[in-house]
Amino acid sequence: MLPFRTYGETIDEYEVQHLLGKGGFACVYKAKCLRSHQNVAIKMIDKKLIQGSGLSNRVRQEVEIHSRLKHPSVLQLYTFFQDANYVYLILELADNGELHRYMNQQMKRPFTEQEAASILRQVVDGLLYLHSHNIMHRDISMSNLLLSKDMHVKIADFGLATQLKRPDERHMTMCGTPNYISPEVVSHQSHGLPADLWSVGCMLYTLLVGRPPFDTDAVQSTLNKVVQSDYTIPGHLSYEARDLIDKLLRKNPHERISLEQVLRHPFMVKAGGSTISYTTNGASDGYGQSIVSGDSGIVTFASNDSKNSHRLRSVEQQATPQMMPQIQEEYGYYQDHRQKYAPHAAYRQSSAETLDSTEMDWQRMGQNAQKANFLAHSTPAAPVPAPVIRKAGKHNTEHISVPPLNTLRLQPTRYKTKNAIMSIVANGEVVIEFIKSKSKMNEDRIIDICRISGDGRRIIIHQPDPGRGLPIQEQTSETHSSGTDNVYNYDNLPSKHWKKYVYAARFVGLVKSKTPKVTYFSALAKCHLMENMTDFEMNYYSGAKLTKSPSEGIKVFDIHGVQLLDQSSSEAKRLIEHSNECFAHCLSICNALELAQTGSNTCFPVTIGRRPVVEVLPSHRPEGLRDTTNFAYSTPKSQQGSINFSISTISSMRSGSDNIGSQLLAAQQNVPIKRLNVPGVGTATELSHGIVQVQFVDGSVISVIPEAQGGGITYTQSNGVSTHFPDHDDLPLSVRDRLSHLPQVQMKLRCAPLISSKKFDCNAMNAKSTASAPWYNRMLI
């Protein structure tokens, strides 16, 4: 920074250029200091507008603290002075504008993890400096982070910051930006320095995802989501990124990671000492630099034209640094542009806190003018025309609405819908074969094929035999190298193919939501944490079941398969409480193993623990079955409503030798009477109780149970997990696809001869193990 004396102390010592922003009570201009010939930003606060507002103490406090701050990551206030009409703040000019606008207009994409780590490191350094002086910023957001000409991040807008007398001092004022405000602030609870850590977590999420974690169309709904900590981390982020976001966005402020720990987190260590080095077209002299040079000030309420995404502003005393915040935001600047990128208007709520009555002596601060009384509310200024930027904003909306897909660890599978056949093949490629009915050929044909690499970056569009298409085959069509193939990457995929990519990404997301990443056997249940890290399934040994997903929330089923709609009941509470413990434990297991992974050596999928063994006295086992039925006692039922067809009537352990004996005798009678191989399908078996069971070539099993035996359908996946579906229940598409073979199977079973030997065959009744099953069609839907 240039010495203090190099800056003029009257407005006549500056060459005031064009307007950068205009807001509630101040205007910001680009200017050139005639002494130093340095470009600066001048914020001119109109004294007439702030008279009687009662906010003068805030600004005096803000300026007093800001003028004492000096750090590379904090926007600099060079000097200030006043005359009869205005208070002037001479501020550092950040040439590349606010970070959020830079991401949307210049990069047109979220930041990479390495880029985000570089930004985060600078922000954390700045906050460590502020917190070391007991200064709480309270409004860290993407719009309050500015980029200098050399791409260094500057913390700006200290309009809500406050000076704490000690690090553990607490405040009660509700203030901040809704998308970044912490739960304790929204709830009007006491809050301190950890409130800034929550904002840092929201900032990191926004850097990596491109939108804030709690973003909605209305302020109130956003605040509701904040209070509930209702957010979802996309699965495409690395484990380290997800873990750091999770540690920053802890609802309990005492559980949040500290700033020092952020710098030592694996996410930061992995990124190393990287710096921001993105290419840019440079900020324009008018519009671009205004993003950098705005200052916050204090306003009451001003909504922009786009969304009800506002800024919460407290009337509490501001005791903090850098008054070089972005004026365009808080003054309603560039309202028409903000609606396209990061709608943040100014919205302030009066505070219950009182201000220190001590006033700052402007002359004591090196100024020869009377004390300033400033801050008020005024009309937002009209936007400055910027056609080039406006065009860039329009273009920014044109991008694929999903991040690059990733099929890492997903098993090959093939799945058919009405309009397409979706597959994940052995090399991880996603293949979408689009189907169209050809009336001339009287059949459906494959008319378009989209192949996407496992990392989602390469896309091949192919039209086989144009005009005719290909017949539908049992296996995914091979790649045809021809001049008609169109090869693209994720960044240059034409918009006409975006729907294909989104279709594939949703399919991969569905597969992830049904593919276990961590299988954990607790004392009460078998647990599956799915690959997307959000879907969770609990199959209690008692027969109860619990599922958890972002789309459907928590569903609880009792031992009879009936959904418990009242989750406040004692039974539901018990199941939910145990599931929460297991979910947290599975996440911890996953986190630990992620850290242990090196390169391509993956630890997943992983199974932890084993099913508890239930001892049964020999006297309770009927003669002749003691050696063949031990497994029935050691393996309780794992899924709600599932049926173990090796001993089909045993669903749970009960006391009493008579009851157990009768169950086992009934099971002994349910033996195979017919069996045959169906080409292209698998092995079909009819049991003596009327159950028809089809074991498919992928190891999965479909069992159709007659009404006399309880009715319904049981689907056993190739990994041994079974699910029972009652009659008239909605069936997953994978089950319906397998059931489509049933008429053919039943017809052949009618003609099949009876098995001559009635010997109980346990192997025929169980699904093949995953190890021996073929590689295809293992999707768990």
Swiss-Prot record:
Native source species: Drosophila virilis (Fruit fly)
UniProt keyword Iron present: no
MF terms (GO), sorted A to Z: ATP binding; protein serine kinase activity; protein serine/threonine kinase activity
UniProt-annotated catalytic positions: 139
Domain Protein kinase intervals: 14-268
Residue ranges of the region described as Disordered: 463-486
Keywords: ATP-binding, Cytoplasm, Cytoskeleton, Kinase, Nucleotide-binding, Serine/threonine-protein kinase, Transferase, Ubl conjugation
Location of the POLO box domain: 672-751
Protein name per UniProt: Serine/threonine-protein kinase PLK4
Domain of life where this protein originates: Eukaryota
Record GO cellular component, one term: centriole
Subcellular location: Cytoplasm, Cytoskeleton, Microtubule organizing center, Centrosome, Centriole
Entry-linked Gene3D superfamilies: 2.40.50.930, 3.30.1120.120, 3.30.1120.130, Transferase(Phosphotransferase) domain 1
Domain Cryptic POLO box 1 (CPB1): 397-514
Main subcellular localisation: cytoplasm
Protein residues bound to ATP: 20-28, 43
Composition-biased stretches (Polar residues): 473-486
UniProt subunit comment: Homodimer.
